Amino acid sequence: MTVRLIVKYPDPRLRAAAEPVTTFDEGLRKLADDLLDTMRAAPGIGITAPHIGISKRVVVLELDRAAGPKIYINPEIVWACEEKIRHQEGSVSMPGVVDEVERHARIRLRYQDLDGNEQTEESDGLLAVCHQHEIDQLDGIFWVQRLSRLRRERLIKRYEKLQR
């Protein structure tokens, strides 16, 4: 297990769609372990392989350390309810800034586990927000793109100030 270097905004790799995982082997398990260590060190509650510069559709979430991490390979949203919720979001690739983003309140997800077995999961609240946020990242949509232009520009200025 290794803490990897996190790609920082505005690195263009954060806006590129990730490639599907096709090989389910020890290398994938090592990647998932490294993502978990990196996310915990950041600290954060979610991370994707593109956050460490690897173009693979891998997500690790850990909303509650006691419950342990969840690993999603090739996740996709197959259903979303009409109702929307707003929640504070941020990124390990843009530390120190957050803003409110609107997302579906409830979704159904299809993904594979580390052995390649297909799984489905329904989520709501914060977990649904995290699923949508990280799948956006896998699709090359960095979370600030979900903000209005004015809010995005203000947030980027705040982030740039923090980086000085």
UniProtKB/Swiss-Prot annotation:
GO annotation (BP), single: co-translational protein modification
Q: Name one GO molecular function term.
A: peptide deformylase activity
Kindly identify the residues recorded as the active site.
134
Q: Cross-referenced Pfam families, in alphabetical order?
A: Pep_deformylase
Q: Report the family membership.
A: Belongs to the polypeptide deformylase family.
Q: Write down what this protein is called.
A: Peptide deformylase-like
